[in-house]
């Protein structure tokens, strides 16, 4: 479910490590106070534990919060380590993250800008 989550308009990740003992209220408070974002929007907020093998997702669905939790059996997420930062992800970056890849792919094809016909 979390690998192909399409219900949200935006996806944000809390960079660095989050204490995953926090529940809905603690994570929603973190979104509001630390990142100055509104947890009551159609946005998926992702948090990663210290071992990088589990993540929690917080999502508001019209009448209540959904708390998603995923623990990898093998491997780890390529999670950005910079503390106290939140990043917005493109749909492609979200897929890369869920597939175990870094969100910045140096070898990925970049969109072409400034097109002209020769």
Language model features with spans:
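Polybasic/polar functional segments that serve as interface/processing modules
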Residues: 1-118
């Amino acid at each position: 479910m979390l690998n192909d989550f399409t219900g949200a308009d935006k996806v944000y990740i809390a960079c660095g490590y989050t204490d995953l003992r926090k529940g809905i209220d603690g994570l929603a408070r973190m979104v509001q106070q630390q990142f100055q974002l509104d947890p009551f929007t159609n946005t998926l907020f992702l948090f990663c534990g210290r071992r990088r093998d589990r993540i929690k997702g917080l999502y508001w669905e019209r009448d209540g919060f959904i708390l998603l939790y995923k623990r990898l059996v093998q491997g780890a997420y390529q999670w950005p380590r910079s503390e106290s930062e939140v990043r917005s992800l493109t749909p492609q970056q979200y897929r890369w993250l869920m597939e175990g890849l870094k969100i910045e792919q140096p070898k990925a094809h970049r969109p072409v800008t400034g097109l002209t016909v020769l």
